[in-house]
From Swiss-Prot:
Chain positions found as Phosphoserine: S745, S756
Protein known as: Integrin beta-2
Gene Ontology molecular functions: amyloid-beta binding; integrin binding; metal ion binding; protein kinase binding
Side of membrane Cytoplasmic, spans: 724-769
All copies of domain VWFA, residue ranges: 124-363
Binding positions for Ca(2+) 2 per the UniProt entry: D173, N229, D231, P233, E234
Family: Belongs to the integrin beta chain family.
Disease as annotated in the protein's UniProt record: Defects in ITGB2 are the cause of leukocyte adhesion deficiency (LAD). All cattle with the mutant allele are related to one bull, who through the use of artificial insemination sired many calves in the 1950s and 1960s.
């Protein structure tokens, strides 16, 4: 009972969720029962005749069941199809581990349907085990022990199942650089010790088809020789792909399939083939010829994801038997490949039988429930209720660990369609097992109404009644098929009910009857919809104090605009009509530079409230008023002859007043200083002018010329005097130097250039004697 409690809680949660969803229904643009069913899981359709009133749309028929009942629709007339699930149990005596085998679902859009799938782990289920071994030179000791494993492997399988078979295959790597040495001698014997007999390298060789003959296993494996390659990673993924893609060649039965992958190193994967100029992606197909993968140099290595998909598709559970240094690497690989296990292999593979037994027990005690590829319109989730008391809900796949023999576990599968789907099917299976559940999916979008007939009295003899709504014959339209199209298409008639091509018919608020909009009656009290295209109403206007247009005493709403009473104004009739707060001292509204709205000045750009009297940022028109200032004050200038006409708007003030100071030249070049005072209105100024003009006298030409000439002459004379003084000082300095040299001179009678013609030579021997 305790184990069933999570299931009961989940079912209660689902019912509560559906109850919440059933309280909502979006019925916009709904005209048929099918449209209603598609619009939401909480919608229902009332097929009662004459359920809609005058001017009401057919979408009124679509609502939640509670709302339809409250509107007077009898419960028998409410169409509310539900999602359903029908299951067919397996035949008695069948060894199927999954039940049921077939499920038929009728899916309504947005409404989930749930059904249970039970898995019961069978005892002694048949097993096929394929031993795939790395024959690179580093595995030479392992091969010796594997050659003796045939009997031990079969005995181990027979301890688990009544029917076990074993097979064998081997791999090295692609036979191109840089994976193997392509020197002809090295291709014949790739082993480092030339005296040792080795076989040429190869990608994958299928040695023995799955069999229950242990002697044959030992015989065929005993013929195998070690090989070799260059780099550390091996081509194991290539070999695994061929084992999964060639079921007939390998001899797989429709039973539990185990693939033991034995190696002491890593693996190449997609993209590594480019190192050997192999660019074509792996196609995931079988390419065995004479039990050899001869196309390995044409296709790149498979990706891990590609291999995982192929293994799952073929129901193959890999067991990675690897040495201690590679355990962590292959544990990462098992995180990507579902239903796989890793075991630590001894250096000489002595423990491989025990490793396989432990890995099988680990794999068979965990169950993953998954489904085949689905379209985007279908969503499948799983709730797992495991035998160990643990549960998971709303997961992308079912998952239970610690599964025991003959102890059932339950998965609740929930399927939801996002729209009305086409009839289709998919399969659910436990990964690594051959049993499947076939799920057939059909749409649940039609209403089984009772009134489908051609009763002439209902639709005027021009149509049939379907779910309470008339479906008119060709040439007639209208709620009761009362309108004859007279050769016009329905598109043409609908076009006259659209404001423009981008708008919807009758603004979505009316029905197009004979090319004219008949507006709906609104559910909102006192709301009236009107207009040629039903585009207007009497409530969608601005509100003041919580009421449309401030209430009926202030104004009424007409098609989005408030029409105010004579005493009120404003976009929402929020203001009394008054200008008292907008008048300046002279009684001018907003100083003539703005408009009074709601008793507040709305000033022209630049002018400041409250009365629009100042404009700090506006330029002062000093230059523009200079001619009028000159003629008004001094009776001269360009406007002297018609000053009163040209400057009639400008008043000359006799006393100084505060305003904008100006200083401009008059027509004679004199400076005028005056003050502009702005009056009410725009560009209207009074002016006060200072009495005195600032006139600058002309320059003295003679003084300027005389001074210039005199200055040039004086500069020339000064330069000559300086030059003369400098030359005199230089001559004086040279004269004094000459005098000093003269005093130092000593004269005699000898000619310093004369040399005597007589030469005297002394004999050194003569001196000694």
């Amino acid at each position: 009972m305790l184990r069933q409690r999570p299931q009961l809680l989940l079912l209660a949660g689902l019912l509560a969720l559906q109850s919440v969803l059933s309280q909502e229904c979006t019925n916009y643009k709904v005209s048929t029962c099918r449209d209603c069913i598609e619009s939401g899981p909480g919608c229902a359709w009332c097929q009662k005749l004459n359920f809609t009133g005058q001017g009401e749309p057919d979408s009124i028929r679509c609502d939640t069941r509670a709302e339809l009942l409250s509107k007077g629709c009898p419960a028998d007339d409410i169409m509310e199809p539900k999602s359903l699930a029908e299951t067919r149990d397996s035949q008695a005596g069948s060894r199927k581990q999954l039940s049921p085998q077939e499920v038929t679902l009728y899916l309504r859009p947005g409404q989930a349907v749930a059904f249970n799938v039970t898995f019961r782990r069978a005892k002694g289920y048949p097993i096929d085990l394929y031993y795939l071994m790395d024959l690179s030179y580093s595995m030479v000791d392992d091969l010796v022990n594997v050659k003796k494993l045939g009997g031990d492997l079969l005995r181990a399988l027979n301890g688990i199942t009544e029917s076990g078979r074993i097979g064998f295959g081997s791999f090295v790597d692609k036979t191109v650089l840089p994976f193997v040495n392509t020197h002809p001698e090295k291709l014949r014997n790739p082993c480092p010790n030339k005296e040792k007999e080795c076989q040429p390298p190869f990608a994958f060789r299928h040695v023995l088809k799955l069999t229950d003959n242990s002697k044959q296993f030992e015989t065929e494996v005993g013929k195998q020789l070690i090989s070799g390659n260059l780099d550390a990673p091996e081509g194991g993924l290539d070999a695994m792909m061929q084992v999964a893609a060639c079921p007939e060649e390998i001899g797989w039965r429709n039973v539990t399939r185990l693939l033991v992958f034995a190696t002491d190193d890593g693996f190449h994967f997609a993209g590594d083939g480019k190192l050997g100029a192999i660019l074509t992606p792996n196609d995931g197909r079988c390419h065995l010829e004479d039990n050899l993968y001869k196309s390995s140099n044409e296709f790149d290595y498979p990706s891990v994801g590609q291999l995982a998909h192929k293994l799952a598709e073929s129901n193959i559970q890999p067991i990675f038997a690897v040495t201690k240094k590679m355990v962590k690497t292959y544990e990462k690989l098992t995180e990507i490949i579902p239903k796989s296990a890793v075991g630590e292999l001894s250096e000489d593979s002595r423990n491989v039988v025990e490793l396989i037994k432990n890995a099988y027990n680990k794999l068979s005690s965990r169950v993953f429930l998954d489904h085949s590829t689905l379209p985007d319109t279908l969503k499948v989730t799983y709730d797992s209720f495991c035998s160990n008391g643990k549960s998971q809900v709303d997961q992308p796949r079912g998952d239970c660990d610690g599964v025991q023999i003959n102890v059932p576990i339950t998965f609740q599968v929930k399927v939801t369609a996002t729209e009305c789907i086409q009839q289709q099917s998919f399969t659910i299976r436990a990964l690594g097992f051959t049993d499947t559940v076939t799920v057939r999916v059909l749409p649940q979008c039609e209403c089984q109404c009772r009134d489908a007939s051609r009763d002439g009295s209902i639709c005027g003899g021009r149509g049939s009644m379907e779910c309470g709504v008339c479906r008119c014959d060709a040439g007639y339209i209208g709620k009761n098929c009362e309108c004859q199209t007279q050769g016009r298409s329905s598109q043409e008639l609908e076009g006259s009910c659209r404001k423009d091509n981008s708008s919807i018919i009758c603004s979505g608020l009316g029905d197009c009857i004979c090319g004219q909009c008949v507006c709906h009656t609104s559910d909102v009290p006192n709301k009236k919809i009107y207009g040629q295209f039903c585009e207007c109403d009497n409530v969608n206007c601005e509100r003041y104090d919580g009421q449309v247009c401030g209430g009926e005493k202030r104004g009424l709403c007409f098609c989005g605009t408030c029409r105010c009473d004579e005493q009120y104004e404003g976009s929402a009739c929020q203001c009394l009509k008054s200008t008292q707060g907008c008048l300046n001292l002279d009684g001018v509204e907003c100083s003539g530079r703005g408009r009074c709205r709601c008793n507040v000045c709305q000033c022209d750009p630049g002018y400041q409230p409250p009365l629009c009297s100042e404009c700090p940022g506006c330029p002062v028109p000093c230059a523009g008023f200079a001619p009028c200032t000159e003629c008004l004050k001094f009776d001269k200038g360009p406007f002297a002859k018609n000053c009163s006409a040209a400057c009639g708007q400008t008043k000359l003030l006799s006393s100084p007043v505060p305003g904008r100071k100006c200083k401009e030249r008059d027509s004679e070049g004199c400076w005028m200083t005056y003050t502009l005072v702005q009056r009410d209105g725009r560009d209207r100024y009074d002016v006060h002018v200072d009495d005195m003009l600032e006139c600058v006298k002309g320059p003295n030409i003679a003084a300027i010329v005389g001074g210039t000439v005199g200055g040039v002459v004086l500069v020339g004379i000064l330069l000559l005097v300086i030059w003369k003084a400098l030359t005199h000082l230089s001559d004086l300095r040279e004269y004094h130097r000459f005098e000093k040299e003269k005093l130092k001179s000593q004269w005699n009678n000898d000619n310093p250039l004369f040399k005597s013609a007589t030469t005297t030579v002394m004999n050194p021997k003569f001196a000694e004697s």
